[in-house]
A protein has these predicted regions:
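PLP-dependent enzyme catalytic core of the Aspartate aminotransferase-like
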Residues: 151-154, 163-198
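Active-site PLP attachment segment
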Residues: 28-63
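Catalytic PLP-binding core of fold-type I/II PLP enzymes
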Residues: 1-22
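A short glycine-threonine-serine/GTX helix/turn-capping micro-motif
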Residues: 68-77
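Short hydrophobic/aromatic beta-strand micro-patches
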Residues: 55, 133-137, 174-176
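Active-site core of PLP-dependent enzymes with the aminotransferase class I/II
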Residues: 1-4, 140-142, 182
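Conserved PLP-dependent catalytic core of the aminotransferase class-I/II
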Residues: 79, 86-121, 128, 132-155
Length: 198
C-alpha cells in the first residue's frame, strides 16, 4: 500500500476481543497496528451490542462524515447500545485473559468436532478464531440438521448458497470465553449425534 500511496483499511468485525494482545484485534495479532490508516468493526460480535465504529485520522473521519451515503443517511445508535459496547470493552480491558481462554476453547472444540467425525473446513482447523464451520454440503440437509440441533438446545447458524459455493453448505458454530469444556462436550455430542443420523 505504501508503495502506491494507498491507505490501509482493516475491517475487523471478527478480530476485536478475539485476536491480538488482550483481544486488540487483527492488526495487533499480525504486529501491524502502526500501519493501519482506517480501522473499523462492529459492536455486534464480541461487544454484545449493535452498531459499529471507525477509527482514522481527522482528515479521513471528516471525509466519511460528509461523503459516505450510508453514514449520512443513518441514525446514531441508541445510548443503551453504546453503553453496552463500552462496558464490554472495559471488561475486556480488565480481563485480558479472556481472549486466550476463548482461543483455548476454540482449539478444544475443533479437536472435539473432528474426533466426533465431523468435517471442518481445512482452513479453519488451525485458525485462532471462535467460529468453526462444519460442512453439511447439501442445503436442505443443512436446514434439517440445524433445526434438529436447535430443538435439542444448541444453536448453530446454517450457512447456505449464495453465502457458500453450491454443494458446500455448512453449520457455523461460534464459541464464547464463558463456555466450559463440559458445555462444549454436551453441545458437540448433540451435533455429532444429529449429523450421524442425517
Amino acid at each position: 500500500a505504501k508503495q502506491y500511496g494507498a491507505r490501509v483499511m482493516v475491517d475487523d468485525a471478527h478480530g476485536l476481543g478475539v485476536l491480538g494482545e488482550g483481544g486488540r484485534g487483527t492488526a495487533s495479532y499480525f504486529g501491524l497496528e502502526d500501519q493501519v490508516d482506517v480501522y473499523m468493526g462492529t459492536f455486534s460480535k464480541s461487544l454484545a451490542s449493535l452498531g459499529g465504529y471507525m477509527a482514522a485520522s481527522a482528515e479521513v473521519a471528516d471525509f466519511v462524515r460528509h461523503a459516505s451515503r450510508p453514514f449520512i443517511f443513518s441514525a446514531s445508535i441508541p445510548p443503551a447500545n453504546c453503553a453496552t459496547a463500552l462496558a464490554a470493552l472495559q471488561k475486556l480491558e480488565k480481563h485480558p485473559e479472556l481472549p486466550e481462554r476463548l482461543r483455548a476453547l476454540s482449539l478444544y472444540a475443533r479437536k472435539g468436532l473432528t474426533d466426533r467425525g465431523l468435517t471442518i473446513r481445512p482452513s479453519a482447523l488451525e485458525a485462532p478464531t471462535p467460529i468453526i464451520p462444519i460442512y453439511t454440503y447439501e442445503t436442505y440437509r443443512t436446514l434439517r440438521v440445524a433445526a434438529e440441533i436447535y430443538d435439542r438446545g444448541v444453536y448453530v447458524n446454517p450457512t447456505l448458497p449464495p453465502d457458500t459455493p453450491e454443494g458446500e453448505a455448512l453449520l457455523r458454530t461460534s464459541y464464547m470465553a464463558t463456555h466450559t469444556e463440559a458445555l462444549l462436550d454436551e453441545a458437540m455430542d448433540i451435533i455429532g449425534e444429529v449429523m450421524a443420523r442425517e
